[in-house]
């Protein structure tokens, strides 16, 4: 059964998972997380479970992490690993997972779609050579006996996933898609996340009609966190978000993003004058408005393709891509600039629409932004100051903050 714990940051999701693991010593677990620091925390918090992180430094497994992973699964060992490694599990590994009766714990959203850049001619060569087949826009491997280099990455990925083609009006896109067996092979699955409905793992479950139920977090009198079916614990800080997140209200600086699609990826590509004005605004913000703030307290994030267009003196090396959710390296940063206006890319939307899923782009944008903001010092309980030039993005954050006005924190 898939159980979704959709709770705000700091509600105790990871702590509840640790409690669950420690209270079920007879079960076997695979815990996946965006970053290795969290894997280390799970190992430390569950000493009796003896979690192992698969390694690519072991000679007996040919210095390949996936071979070490396969051996650990076959032995029924508890594993802590990253999202990226998890997405490469092969059918043989999934067979062993079913046999062993593993429980899966997914910490944060897993991207179920990944764009893959490959010429159609290369795919056709592989088809003509009898290595792969194509049916209704889906490519899968039929002959594993390929030892070349030119298509090594393609064959490596086809071991664990299917490649799909999505035809747009002006281009053809290719995507790797997670197989539903990656979820269905486990006895139980816990998904620890926030703003679940805006995330790809939610759409994935809907597409494949995989049933799920919600669980909450209970916080007992001794300070322990546990999964529960009743009303959940809400951390006390949420009632003070208005006092913790200071959103810049500067009409002159905000004017650059008044339009609904201003600061979208397309806007950056087609509006050089606007981009230059935005760069000047960011410089003004850090040079004059926040001029006394140390460089190591600054953090700004946009599309990677916009970095060179927006970089400037005093903040260029404080860049963190807008969709980062897997780092604690910026937890001392207090003065933020978020010059983006996120919309789901065309290929993703076409894939979901093809499967009857209508995505909520506002929820998607909010979930990405909140994860980025929580890379800063607010995760440590400190106040932050943030400049969000896009009106749409800024209002999404303000409405989200307002939504906590009527919430009463629960301690149990």
Segments the model singles out, each with a brief description of its role:
Residues 27-38, 189-193, 289, 297-304, ...:
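Conserved RecA-like ASCE P-loop NTPase motor core of nucleic-acid helicases/translocases
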Residues 48-89, 303:
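Inter-Walker segment of RecA-like/P-loop motor cores
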Residues 84-86, 94-140, 148-165:
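SF2 helicase catalytic motif II
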Residues 178, 187-188, 194-326, 345, ...:
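Conserved helicase/translocase motor-coupling segment
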């Amino acid at each position: 059964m898939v159980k979704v714990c959709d709770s705000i940051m700091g509600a105790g999701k990871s702590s509840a998972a640790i409690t669950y693991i420690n209270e079920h010593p007879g079960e076997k677990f695979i815990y996946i997380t965006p970053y290795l620091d969290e894997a280390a925390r799970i190992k430390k918090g569950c000493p009796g479970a003896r979690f192992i992180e698969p390694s690519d430094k072991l000679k007996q497994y040919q210095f390949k992490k996936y071979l070490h992973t396969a051996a650990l699964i076959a032995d029924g060992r508890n594993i802590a690993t990253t999202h990226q490694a998890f997405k490469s599990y092969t059918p043989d590994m999934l067979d062993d997972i079913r046999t062993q009766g593993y429980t899966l714990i997914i910490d944060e959203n897993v991207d179920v779609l990944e764009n893959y850049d490959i010429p159609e001619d290369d795919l056709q060569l592989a088809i003509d050579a009898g290595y792969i087949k194509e049916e209704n826009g889906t490519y899968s491997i039929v002959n594993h006996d390929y030892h070349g280099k030119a298509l090594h990455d393609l064959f490596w990925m086809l071991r664990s996933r299917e490649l799909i083609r999505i035809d747009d009006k002006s281009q053809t896109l290719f995507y790797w898609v997670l197989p539903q067996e990656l979820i269905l092979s486990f006895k139980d699955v816990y998904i620890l996340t926030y703003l679940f409905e805006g995330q790809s793992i939610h759409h994935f479950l809907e597409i494949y009609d995989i049933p799920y139920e919600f669980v909450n977090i209970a916080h007992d009198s001794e300070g322990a966190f546990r999964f529960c079916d009743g009303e959940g614990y809400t951390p006390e800080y949420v009632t003070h978000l208005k006092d913790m997140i200071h959103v810049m209200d500067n009409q002159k600086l905000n004017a650059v993003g008044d339009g609904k699609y201003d600061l979208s990826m397309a806007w950056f590509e087609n509006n050089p004058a606007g981009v230059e004005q935005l760069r000047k605004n960011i410089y003004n913000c850090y040079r004059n408005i926040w001029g006394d703030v140390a460089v190591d307290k600054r953090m700004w994030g946009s599309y990677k393709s916009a970095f060179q267009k927006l970089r400037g003196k005093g903040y260029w090396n404080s860049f963190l891509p807008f969709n980062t959710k897997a780092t604690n390296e910026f937890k001392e940063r207090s003065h933020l600039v978020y010059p983006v206006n996120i919309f789901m890319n065309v290929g993703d939307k076409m894939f979901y629409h093809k499967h009857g899923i209508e995505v909520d782009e506002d929820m998607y944008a909010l979930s990405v932004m909140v994860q980025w903001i929580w890379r800063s010092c607010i995760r440590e309980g400190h106040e932050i100051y943030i400049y969000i030039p896009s009106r749409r993005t800024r209002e999404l954050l303000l409405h989200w903050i307002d939504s906590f006005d009527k919430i009463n924190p629960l301690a149990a």
